[in-house]
A protein has these predicted regions:
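Residues that form generic nucleotide/phosphate-binding pockets
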Residues: 37, 55, 59, 81, ...
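Canonical AAA+ ATPase core
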Residues: 1-67, 121-123
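Conserved AAA+ ATPase small/helical "lid" subdomain
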Residues: 53, 60-136
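C-terminal engagement/docking regions of AAA+ P-loop ATPases
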Residues: 125-181
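Acidic-enriched, low-complexity/disordered segments with a strong bias for Aspartate over Glutamate
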Residues: 6, 24, 50, 91, ...
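Generic alpha-helix detector with strongest preference for long hydrophobic helices that associate
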Residues: 11, 15, 19, 36-37, ...
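Signal for well-folded cores of large energy- and translation-related assemblies
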Residues: 24-27, 35, 39, 87-90, ...
């Protein structure tokens, strides 16, 4: 510890666990010497939307209980909509494959979907009536998608206008997301 002019030895069994997303790059790559000192495990994005929805639903329920959020568990349809948005933007096309989309610079991982849902639940619980609605998740969605305020904002606006606006049951998501912008 240079600041204390001291040295501390790790106890037996000490491990460092680091995480990163494939699309998140720092200024410099890790050196090959450092990479050799890590066991690397790559977790792929879930193959199906149903699998991803199940992961998000399970974690959101678990975290909601741990955080003692008084909000109702989110309707599966709200989770499905967030997962659909993330998958379509990640994949660069709509779920039906009919519309090609630009992808934002962020990863839009299941972990981010979990974060969007938990944030929405907290807003619904503490500032709403406890029922998760599109306006509760809109700011989280926008924050997850728009990492680069120039490039990603264009991607998100195009997605809203060409995909979300046209979906019959998604008018509330469209309105809420437009209000946040």
């Amino acid at each position: 510890i240079p600041e204390l002019n001291d040295e501390v030895q790790a106890t037996k069994g000490f491990n460092v666990i680091a995480t990163a997303n494939n699309r998140d790059r720092g200024v410099n790559e890790l050196s090959s010497a450092l990479k050799r000192r890590f066991n690397t495990v790559i977790l792929p994005v879930p193959e199906t939307a149903d699998e991803e929805v199940e992961i998000v639903q399970t974690r959101v329920a678990s975290l909601g209980r741990a955080l003692e959020l008084p909000a109702e568990a989110p309707a599966i349809e709200e989770i499905r909509r967030v997962v659909t948005i993330f998958r379509e933007l990640r994949d660069g096309k709509t779920a039906d494959g009919k519309t090609k989309l630009k992808s934002p610079s962020g990863t839009l991982s299941p972990a981010e979907a979990i974060s969007v849902m938990n944030s929405g639940l907290a807003l619904a619980a503490h500032f709403g009536d406890g029922i998760l609605r599109a306006n509760d998740i809109a700011s989280g969605l926008v924050g997850a998608v728009i990492k680069d305020p120039v490039q990603d904002k264009v991607v998100w606006q195009e997605y809203l206008e060409t995909v979300v606006k046209e979906r019959k049951d998604w008018k509330d998501v469209y309105r809420a997301a437009r209000e946040v912008l």
